Amino acid sequence: MSYRTWLAVCILLILSMVSIGGFTRLTESGLSITEWKPVTGVIPPLSKNAWQKEFDKYKNTPEYKVRHFSISYAEFQFIYLVEYFHRLVGRILGLVFFIGLVYFFVVGNLARESRLRLCFALVLGVIQGFVGWYMVKSGLLDVPAVSHYRLALHLFCASLLFMVLVYEFLSPTVIKGSVFKWHLVGCSLMFLLSMQIILGGLVAGLKAGLICSTFPLMNGEFFPAEIFHELSLNCFNDPVAVQFLHRMSAFLLTFICLVCLVISFFYDRAFRARVFLVASMMLLQMFFGVLTLLFHIPIDIALLHQIMAFILLGICVSFLRVRSG
């Protein structure tokens, strides 16, 4: 397997993890496994007795006592397997990345910068695993839901790992002239998209998408009254305020992309084409976001909305791989 093929496999596994993670959240499966066993946890329950033990552990959680007290044995098996599969793909990703890392460090003629990026990605991957359990643990104590802050952190770590590997995967593009405009647009949009992904994690954690399911107004108001009551850091605990911020951030991102598109017509064709791609994808992403809201978070559209955010990040990273020659 070549170096870039290995990176591509890792990137696809990250996207798979993001998709499965979103499905896990939307089906309320994430708290079904009450323990974190990085090694022995790879083996699922194989007997009826083992399944019953896992079910009994789940019955002691706040989620079961408050929300899922009527769940059947078969329904528990479903949500358990969803969470199990999410963790399994994470283990596969970690194994594939670590084996490839060792192999290419030994036999590959990697530049120092590539080695540093891969080591950073390894550290990020380890942190991401701990953050995942840190998030799940928050929903096993008193409240029957994970901390929305920890969920947002978990999603942000995934996006950061994704950006690092995409950057390493993409081959540098050499152009004539200055690359300032490329890097300015890429860095600006990457930063704003990262903030938007964090806000999206907060929206998901608070289930804020089920509140004010109207567009463009929020239950008849552009500025909901709730946001004026929460003009502090506490606004991140208020579902209405968080959804408002997520909407405004989406408007800002789309506006900036369209402004960049207009400005790009004064530059070369390659730059114009890349900006057009970003602007088009941003409009499509906003469209999926609106559909997710209006149809009360259907799983298929919600997952597409989440994956599109990562695809947009990947396109923005490509701006940083342009070099002057």
Swiss-Prot record:
One of its GO terms (biological process) is heme A biosynthetic process. It catalyses: Fe(II)-heme o + 2 A + H2O = Fe(II)-heme a + 2 AH2. It is a multi-pass membrane protein. The chain crosses the membrane at residues 6-26, 88-108, 116-136, 155-175, 184-204, 248-268, 275-295, 297-317. InterPro entries: COX15/CtaA_fam, HemeA_Synthase_type2. GO terms for cellular component: plasma membrane. HAMAP family: HemeA_synth_type2. Catalyzes the conversion of heme O to heme A by two successive hydroxylations of the methyl group at C8. The first hydroxylation forms heme I, the second hydroxylation results in an unstable dihydroxymethyl group, which spontaneously dehydrates, resulting in the formyl group of heme A. This is Heme A synthase. It comes from Neorickettsia sennetsu (strain ATCC VR-367 / Miyayama).
